[in-house]
């Protein structure tokens, strides 16, 4: 089966929005209009629209899938294939938001016409900026009381520091909003509001003619700046044709020089079709964006994969979801090559092979089994055993790693228990599923207390996961107070000579070890043996190492795992009859306990790299507050019109920060934090911790 749509006719995009900007309604409408459009060629009696509507009403279709494939016939009469990728609403999952931004080629940012640019929009916008994602803006809810298109456009400049390029103007507002002026064609498009109705094209209302002329002039001035030849022609008095103007807007959008702005109301079915036309005209195809970079596994050098079916196969798993009918589904974006059912691929991150069994294409109201897929496609793969989010699957002969996902170790832990005994098993299953989906979340059980401990990247991260457990898996749980994952280390070298002797009738136990314990720069444990002349026989030396490792998990101060210790076995003695591996294990264990005390044990705490993005007005308050949390400011910089404050702050002092920052900045600042390194805890604080845990 050959490729049905050329890769140039693909649009992989997402809808970014603040929680209440109307993302669900907009997505439903897009699926409805594109779905209906897809059905047109199949029935000639007009019944399909009605069936589809009844089905939509019955099921209240919402896009629950991580990616949905649909089709749209553009203004030029040619059909395009859309893959709509869901961007998570929760900005705290920086890893997830960034991964979805990574697999999109373009995005639509939805604004609420009443609220304009809201804090969450700022956050996602800045992340998209980091990945250089081309974006358009749709000012939604134009029918709402207080809707103000021009204020929203102004906020795109003032709050996001972005260049706004209105390609439409609204006709009326609030209850009187009926349609838009198309500034490229210079026509008025109005809708009567019934679902699925096409626009009525007419002349621009007389009272808007001057404004439309003024905005069209601004549009042309901005657009011609993108291209020298167009700029020269314009300065000599030659206006671009409408098609040339569209091409210039496309070029500027893909180069992220400006952002086309459209408007409408998804709920009242006004303005949706022109938005879909704009996706075709202004957002990039996979071939319009730079080739994806990766690491060539064989040579360890950087390489790229072109968006072409002829290139070696490479794909990125970006989301794992549970499907009630199919079980676990791995969503992957194919960047290059062609995928056929039944092939065996290499997971280069895990170093394992995966066989591709069932492949699905998700449509808004159905799932379709497919046998092959091509560059630019987004597929759902059922039954993969080894693959988790962020992994690369590729041709085993041309191995590549597309994304070296560095998942930081969790820094915050909480104990969790099911509310009822009946939920015990369900909770275990739920936690394991969530851990498979989110590599920055871990589950373990505490050997001493028998409690289940979950660990993650921050308070909100764990809150949301506990909430998902309740919503998706119907498991209610009680959660303890968050704990910092402290560590212990040593500060100087100590030499210990320890003899273990036990005589109680029959064969006894005997082992003598002489070990130097000293700190080293890494986090790991290093063991070295300098035994010469057989004072400790070779077969007993692994016992010495095992003994030390067995007690490294609980340091002498407060029982936290130890980091950065080097142990060197320099001498010892044994007995022909009474010595054994076990005897040397016991001796080295005791030697380490004594050595850790003598070598100046100290407590370490996780230090977080914190980045706060805030409007200028609040910088002073933000810095003062971080200083009061034992933070060290490492610098401030301007990003667009916002200020960025970078700091290193102990995790123990970051609890509850999200609320403090919100009230300090009226909800306009946001922050991200990730683990950076461990540092010694100040003496006064260390004493408190020891009292609590020892």
Curated annotation (Swiss-Prot):
Please give the biological process terms from Gene Ontology that the record holds.
Answer: ribosome disassembly
Name one molecular function that GO assigns to this entry: translation elongation factor activity
One Pfam family assigned to this protein is: EFG_III
Q: Which InterPro entries would you find in this protein's record?
A: EFG_II, EFG_III, EFG_III/V, EFG_IV, EFG_V, EFG_V-like, EFTu-like_2, G_TR_CS
- Provide the alphabetized UniProt keywords: Cytoplasm, Elongation factor, GTP-binding, Nucleotide-binding, Protein biosynthesis
Q: Which residues bind GTP?
A: 17-24, 86-90, 140-143
Recorded GO cellular component terms are: cytoplasm
**Residue span, tr-type G domain:** 8-287
Compartments (UniProt record): Cytoplasm
**In terms of domain of life, where is this protein from?**
Bacteria
Query: What does the record give as the function of this protein?
Result: Catalyzes the GTP-dependent ribosomal translocation step during translation elongation. During this step, the ribosome changes from the pre-translocational (PRE) to the post-translocational (POST) state as the newly formed A-site-bound peptidyl-tRNA and P-site-bound deacylated tRNA move to the P and E sites, respectively. Catalyzes the coordinated movement of the two tRNA molecules, the mRNA and conformational changes in the ribosome.
- In which family does this protein belong, per the annotation? Belongs to the TRAFAC class translation factor GTPase superfamily. Classic translation factor GTPase family. EF-G/EF-2 subfamily.
Name this polypeptide is given: Elongation factor G
Q: Which gene encodes it?
A: fusA
């Amino acid at each position: 089966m050959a490729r049905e749509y050329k890769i140039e006719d693909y649009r992989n995009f997402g809808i970014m929005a603040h929680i209440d900007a109307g993302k669900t309604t907009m997505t439903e409408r897009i699926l409805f209009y594109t779905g209906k459009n897809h059905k047109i060629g199949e029935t000639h009696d007009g019944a399909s629209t009605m069936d589809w509507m009844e089905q939509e009403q019955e099921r209240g279709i919402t896009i629950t899938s991580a990616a949905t494939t649909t089709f749209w016939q553009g203004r030029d009469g040619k059909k395009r294939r859309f893959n709509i990728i869901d961007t998570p609403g929760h900005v705290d999952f920086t890893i997830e938001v960034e991964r979805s931004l990574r697999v999109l080629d373009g995005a639509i940012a939805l604004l609420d016409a009443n609220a304009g640019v809201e804090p969450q929009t700022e956050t996602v916008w800045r992340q998209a900026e980091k990945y250089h994602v081309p974006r358009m803006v749709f000012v939604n809810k134009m029918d709402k009381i207080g809707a103000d298109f021009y204020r929203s456009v102004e906020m795109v400049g003032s709050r996001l520091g972005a260049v706004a390029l209105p390609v439409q103007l609204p006709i009326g507002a609030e209850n009187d909003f009926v349609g838009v002026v198309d500034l490229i064609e210079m026509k008025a498009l109005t809708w009567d509001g019934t679902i699925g109705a096409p626009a009525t094209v007419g002349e621009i209302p007389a009272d808007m003619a001057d404004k439309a002329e003024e905005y069209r002039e601004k549009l042309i001035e901005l657009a011609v700046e993108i291209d020298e030849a167009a700029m020269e022609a314009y300065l000599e008095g030659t206006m671009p044709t409408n098609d040339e103007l569209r091409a210039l807007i496309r070029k500027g959008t893909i180069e992220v020089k400006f952002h086309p702005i459209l408007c409408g109301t998804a709920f009242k079915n006004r303005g949706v079709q022109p938005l879909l036309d704009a996706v075709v005209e202004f957002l990039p195809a996979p071939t319009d964006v730079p080739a994806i970079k990766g690491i060539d596994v064989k040579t360890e050098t950087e390489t790229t994969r072109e968006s072409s079916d002829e290139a070696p196969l490479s794909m990125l798993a970006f989301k794992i979801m549970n499907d009630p009918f199919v079980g676990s589904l791995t969503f992957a974006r194919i960047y290059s090559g062609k995928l056929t059912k039944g092939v065996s691929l290499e997971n280069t991150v895990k170093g394992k092979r995966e066989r591709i069994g069932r492949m699905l294409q998700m449509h808004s109201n159905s799932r379709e089994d497919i046998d092959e897929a091509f560059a630019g496609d987004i597929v759902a793969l059922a039954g993969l055993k080894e693959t988790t989010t962020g992994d690369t699957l590729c041709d085993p002969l041309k191995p590549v790693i597309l994304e070296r996902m560095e998942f930081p170790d969790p820094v915050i832990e909480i104990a969790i228990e099911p509310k009822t005994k009946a939920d015990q098993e369900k909770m275990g299953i739920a936690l394991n599923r969530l851990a498979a989906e989110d590599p920055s979340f871990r589950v373990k059980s505490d050997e001493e207390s028998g409690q289940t401990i979950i660990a993650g990247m921050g308070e909100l991260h764990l809150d949301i996961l506990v909430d998902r457990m309740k919503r998706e898996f119907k498991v209610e749980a009680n959660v303890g107070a968050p704990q910092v994952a402290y560590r212990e280390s040593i500060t100087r070298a100590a030499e210990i000579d320890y003899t273990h002797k036990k005589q109680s009738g029959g064969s006894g136990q005997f082992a003598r070890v002489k070990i130097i314990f000293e700190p080293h720069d890494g986090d790991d444990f290093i063991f070295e043996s300098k035994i010469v002349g057989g004072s400790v026989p070779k077969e007993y030396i692994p016992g010495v190492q095992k003994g030390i490792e067995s007690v490294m998990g609980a340091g002498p101060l407060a029982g936290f795992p130890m980091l950065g210790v080097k142990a060197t076995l320099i001498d010892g003695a044994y007995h022909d009859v009474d010595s054994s591996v076990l005897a040397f294990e016991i001796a080295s264990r005791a030697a380490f306990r004594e050595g850790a005390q003598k070598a100046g044990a100290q407590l370490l705490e996780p230090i977080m790299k914190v980045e706060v993005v805030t409007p200028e007005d609040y910088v002073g308050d933000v810095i003062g507050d971080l200083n009061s949390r034992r933070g060290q400011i490492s610098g401030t910089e301007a990003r667009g019109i916002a200020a960025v404050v970078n700091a290193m702050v102990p995790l123990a002092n970051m609890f509850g920060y999200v609320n403090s920052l919100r009230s300090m900045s009226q909800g306009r600042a946001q922050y991200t934090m990730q683990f950076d390194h461990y540092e010694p805890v100040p003496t006064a604080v260390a004493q408190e911790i020891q009292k609590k845990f020892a």
